[in-house]
Amino acid sequence: GLGDVYKRQHYYPAPVLVMQPTLEMGQTFSKDFLAPMIRDTPVLRVLVDTKSRYSGNTILKKNFPGGHVTIIGANSPASLASRPIKVLLCDEVDRYPASAGTEGDPLLLAQKRQTTFWDKKTVIVSTPTIKGSSRIETEFQETTREEWNVPCPKCGHYQPLRWANIVFDRHDLKKGVRHKCERCGRES
């Protein structure tokens, strides 16, 4: 999500489209997450001029050299038209309408905007809702279902990070957070 937006603004500038279920949720996303990330990250603060009225930046669009981040609502067919994008971030897809007006599936409409780019990237995330009719569940079932694995610094065993293996003292967080290896049992 936001990490990819950061990477695209800083290292690999490109047109980015963030699609929220509604335009109102998009505005909230921009105000509560995107704007603070830009404000609090010095390198992004330099790239995205949020102060000048001539920069073209608004709550729903942030311009930077080589690209932009545009935030839209899945319920608005007009915002899905005529917009080539390289990176598509679809948030809370279980809350998307079945159709953007009479235009069709908002996810498919947004993905059509990526045809210009051979190296496009699509990120689809959501909190699952109703089992059996959850869009994110369907998307997950259609993937390879791979998990990111990290090596244990002690024995080298590769394993996914699981919450059950995170070790910390909730009464003294200054002691730090560690990960317990599922094979050797040592913490690092």
Regions found by a protein language model. Give the residues of each.
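Phosphate/NTP-binding elements of NTP-utilizing enzymes
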Residues: 1-188
